[in-house]
């Protein structure tokens, strides 16, 4: 069992425990589907990044920054971290957000060529 499937099962159990849905099977099925699609994306992107096949281009920077922001919001939702770790991730997420906006603007400008 991979780490992401464990994480998605944990998220589903939290959702059911907090009464977000009266049908637990539906929650588990939805979370499982989202987890599988995220795991496919994550493994292919990270494998190519670690193997050096994926150069640090604008789209890969956008992917990395998006993963950092998603990690921060998942920590905020779960709220099981210490205040120091949450403050560090908040700073990292804010920096990532502004870099993401800059990268998206640069990517759009490069592809369109003008305002």
Curated annotation (Swiss-Prot):
InterPro entries: APQ12. Keywords: Endoplasmic reticulum, Membrane, mRNA transport, Nucleus, Transmembrane, Transmembrane helix, Transport. It holds the Pfam family Apq12. The keyword Amino-acid biosynthesis does not apply. The keyword Membrane applies. It is found in: Nucleus membrane; Endoplasmic reticulum membrane. It is a multi-pass membrane protein. One of its GO terms (cellular component) is endoplasmic reticulum membrane. The chain crosses the membrane at residues 58-78, 91-111. Signal peptide: none annotated. GO terms for biological process: membrane lipid metabolic process; mitotic nuclear membrane disassembly; mRNA transport; nuclear envelope organization. Belongs to the APQ12 family. Involved in the regulation of lipid homeostasis in the endoplasmic reticulum, thereby impacting nuclear pore complex biogenesis and localization, and nucleocytoplasmic mRNA transport. This is Nuclear membrane organization protein apq12. The lineage of its organism: Eukaryota, Fungi, Dikarya, Ascomycota, Taphrinomycotina.
């Amino acid at each position: 069992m991979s780490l992401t499937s464990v994480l998605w099962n944990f998220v589903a159990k939290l959702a059911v425990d907090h009464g977000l849905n009266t049908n637990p099977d539906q929650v588990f099925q939805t979370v499982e589907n989202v987890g599988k699609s995220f795991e496919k994306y994550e493994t292919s992107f990270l494998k190519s990044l670690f193997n050096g096949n994926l150069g640090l281009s604008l789209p890969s920077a956008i992917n990395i920054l998006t993963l950092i922001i998603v990690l921060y919001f998942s920590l905020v939702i779960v709220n099981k971290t210490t205040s120091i770790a949450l403050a560090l991730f908040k700073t990292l997420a804010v920096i990532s957000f502004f870099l993401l906006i800059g990268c998206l603007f640069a990517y759009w400008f490069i592809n369109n060529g003008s305002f």
